[in-house]
């Protein structure tokens, strides 16, 4: 198998392998936002929470979209990815047309005035992070795969099928993995 870790960079998807059973990351799809010699960080895309953005974040009372669990690190922080880097100061482009962060007050104003559609944004509590060498070790243990991200995938609401579709998109032997049961030992 190709060394998956070498493919990792901002804008790539990090897919939990079928063998990764740890509850924070089981069958997760993460968007990588930073990846360098000091470590890596990203957000879990397929873990919508029970409550909505309007119930949890001041200034975004009109957003009925679910808030997402970005990961187990600093779960008291709010982050967002979006497709409107042209309109939000301080946004960092992760890959073509997908941005991370920026001026939160400006974002709130643009949403409340109808300039930005809430479907163009995903809000996260916390993030997923790894120190130097940690994620590489997890790749060596077979815990992760990589895949290409698309704007459509980032802003979809098809969370339940996101992992299997992402793994299947890699083709070959991954198609079998994508269809494997969550707990193969119970079959």
UniProtKB/Swiss-Prot annotation:
InterPro entries: AlgH-like. Belongs to the UPF0301 (AlgH) family. The lineage of its organism: Bacteria, Pseudomonadati, Chlorobiota, Chlorobiia, Chlorobiales. This is UPF0301 protein Clim_0777. It comes from the Bacteria. Gene3D superfamilies: VC0467-like. GO terms for cellular component: cytosol. PANTHER family: UNCHARACTERIZED PROTEIN YQGE, UPF0301 PROTEIN YQGE.
